[in-house]
């Protein structure tokens, strides 16, 4: 690794617009392309402080600073365009969380890297709307929060209540939301409002280890812990009335439900298994990287293809997982209001993935190319008229769901043409951590965090209260800064702001 004084490091980073910073070749060894990151004045300070701290004598161990991780990704074989850091970027395993990179599938040296997807494969967000308003929910806010908490299994060791045997799991891994539809857990239209229509077709359950399947079998239909949550939210602001109306959001005060979860222990095991195989492939094919956490394999190698097929199965697991929780959420609301989910208009606005690698067609140097786009802590954001988004959103662009930290606002954005050119149709995914989990536990008291939420009028139900400080707003960047930066640089556009009134956490 290159070790330089902080002032020397800064020579490789150039501010090219009010919210954009170029990372020049040479910042890290063997960079094939430049890097770029997006940050406003507040977010920029965090990026540079992290870099400055890493330059101090004796500062070793842990993850590299985000800006170094962006540059190391820029050195991977077959990368095209730039290695992109979104405004919510923070250090992660291999790739930073909030790092997007695309690889030319026609180039035989191009790679796929599990570190570019993350351990929680297809961690993502689903947003449901209702025809209820805050005035309808406020009188029963606590009861509704409890009903949701009772219906959805949450917490570290939570087990699902959706009936599932080994054969069902195999089918769910291959079919994704088509399995949920067949079993009666979703409405037919839910699939239309889901990235990839809730099913990655290249999934192959035979490429998944028995250990992963054993971990995943009891966990379908569970929220898990960490930063995962189910929130009852209120529409607080509408920035784009036309886009909001296409999503079924007409007025302020309307009630929505956001479900944030992923592939649980199943996806984690798929990633762990793949990293072992990738290290062998790297030795055989003499692939060198700047960081051993960037373990990878040629896309068209056996290991590369096996990972992509197993990753797709994990993505399908996550869509079935969120679909099962959608079913349970609809039941909880119907029970509380003594009606049906249909009568409550509990439609899915959209479902997006934040951790995935996908084959997509993009323009590179004026020509269409098939790319493998790695999005880790990054959301696909397709523009109006794109063939991969449903008819309902052809005029608005794809809805992009951005969850805030616990107790803070969330946003719905829309994809833009500029984003297609600048970031291969990618934008931020959330607030992004500013404190590590360990520092959060040391610096914050969970009782204070719970009191603050109650003071804001938020009903809170938590399976593991002592883990709450890890997810406190003080542990994260301000999601408003993140979203505004994306809006200002034009890679996505603000449509709706949502405020939580009830939070269910593991």
Curated annotation (Swiss-Prot):
It catalyses: a 3'-end 3'-phospho-ribonucleotide-RNA + a 5'-end dephospho-ribonucleoside-RNA + GTP = a ribonucleotidyl-ribonucleotide-RNA + GMP + diphosphate; a 3'-end 2',3'-cyclophospho-ribonucleotide-RNA + a 5'-end dephospho-ribonucleoside-RNA + GTP + H2O = a ribonucleotidyl-ribonucleotide-RNA + GMP + diphosphate + H(+). The keyword Cell membrane does not apply. SUPFAM superfamilies: Hypothetical protein PH1602. It comes from the Eukaryota. Transmembrane segments: none annotated. GO terms for biological process: tRNA splicing, via endonucleolytic cleavage and ligation. Keywords: GTP-binding, Ligase, Manganese, Metal-binding, Nucleotide-binding, tRNA processing. Mn(2+) 1 binds at residues 120, 123, 228. GO terms for molecular function: GTP binding; metal ion binding; RNA ligase (ATP) activity; RNA ligase (GTP) activity. Its EC number is 6.5.1.8. The active site is at residue 429. Pfam families: RtcB (PF01139). One of its GO terms (cellular component) is tRNA-splicing ligase complex. Ligation probably proceeds through 3 nucleotidyl transfer steps, with 2',3'-cyclic phosphate termini being hydrolyzed to 3'-P termini in a step that precedes 3'-P activation with GMP. In the first nucleotidyl transfer step, RTCB reacts with GTP to form a covalent RTCB-histidine-GMP intermediate with release of PPi; in the second step, the GMP moiety is transferred to the RNA 3'-P; in the third step, the 5'-OH from the opposite RNA strand attacks the activated 3'-P to form a 3',5'-phosphodiester bond and release GMP. Catalytic component of the tRNA-splicing ligase complex. Catalytic subunit of the tRNA-splicing ligase complex that acts by directly joining spliced tRNA halves to mature-sized tRNAs by incorporating the precursor-derived splice junction phosphate into the mature tRNA as a canonical 3',5'-phosphodiester. May act as an RNA ligase with broad substrate specificity, and may function toward other RNAs. This is RNA-splicing ligase RtcB homolog.
């Amino acid at each position: 690794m290159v070790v330089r004084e902080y002032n020397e490091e800064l020579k490789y980073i150039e501010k090219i617009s009010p919210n954009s910073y170029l990372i020049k070749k040479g910042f890290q060894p063997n960079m094939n392309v430049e890097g770029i990151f997006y940050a406003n004045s507040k977010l920029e300070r965090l990026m540079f402080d992290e870099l400055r701290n890493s330059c101090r004598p004796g500062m070793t161990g842990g993850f590299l600073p985000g800006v170094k991780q962006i540059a190391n990704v820029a050195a991977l074989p077959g990368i095209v365009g730039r290695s992109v850091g979104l405004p919510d970027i923070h250090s992660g395993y291999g790739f930073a969380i909030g790092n997007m990179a695309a690889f030319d599938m026609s180039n035989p040296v191009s790679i796929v890297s599990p570190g570019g997807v993350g351990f929680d494969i297809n961690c993502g967000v689903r947003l449901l709307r209702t025809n209820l308003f805050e005035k309808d929910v406020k009188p029963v806010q606590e009861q509704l929060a409890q009903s949701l908490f009772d219906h959805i299994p949450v917490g570290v060791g939570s087990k699902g209540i959706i009936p599932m045997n080994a054969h069902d799991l195999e089918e769910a891994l291959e079919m994704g939301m088509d399995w949920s539809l067949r079993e009666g857990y979703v409405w037919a239209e839910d699939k239309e409002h889901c990235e990839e229509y809730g099913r990655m077709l290249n999934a192959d359950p035979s490429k998944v280890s028995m250990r992963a399947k054993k971990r995943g079998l009891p966990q379908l239909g569970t929220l898990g812990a960490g930063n995962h949550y189910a929130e009852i939210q209120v529409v607080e602001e509408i920035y784009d009335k036309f886009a909001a109306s296409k999503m079924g959001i007409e007025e302020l005060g309307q009630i929505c439900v956001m479900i944030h979860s992923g592939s649980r222990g199943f996806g984690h095991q798929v990633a762990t298994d793949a990293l072992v195989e990738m290290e062998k492939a790297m030795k055989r094919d003499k692939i060198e990287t700047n960081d051993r956490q960037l373990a990878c394999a040629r896309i068209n190698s056996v290991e590369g293809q096996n990972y992509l097929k197993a990753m797709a199965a994990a993505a399908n697991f996550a869509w079935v997982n969120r679909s099962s929780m959608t079913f349970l959420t609809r039941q909880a609301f119907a029970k509380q209001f003594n009606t049906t989910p249909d009568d409550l208009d509990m439609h899915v606005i959209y479902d997006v993935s934040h951790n995935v690698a996908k084959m997509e067609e993009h323009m590179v140097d004026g020509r269409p190319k098939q790319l493998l786009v790695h999005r880790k802590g990054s959301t696909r954001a397709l523009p109006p008229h794109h063939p991969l988004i449903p008819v309902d959103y052809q005029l608005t662009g794809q809805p992009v769901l951005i969850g805030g930290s616990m107790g803070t606002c969330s946003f719905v954005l829309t994809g833009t043409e500029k984003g297609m050119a600048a970031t291969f149709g990618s934008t931020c995914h959330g607030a992004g951590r500013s404190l590590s989990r360990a520092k959060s536990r040391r610096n914050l008291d969970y009782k204070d965090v719970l009191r603050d939420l109650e003071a804001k009028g938020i009903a809170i139900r938590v399976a593991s209260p002592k883990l709450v400080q890890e997810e406190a707003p003080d542990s994260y960047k301000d999601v408003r800064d993140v979203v505004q930066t994306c809006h200002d640089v034009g890679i996505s556009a603000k449509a709706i702001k949502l405020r939580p009134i009830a939070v269910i956490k593991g």
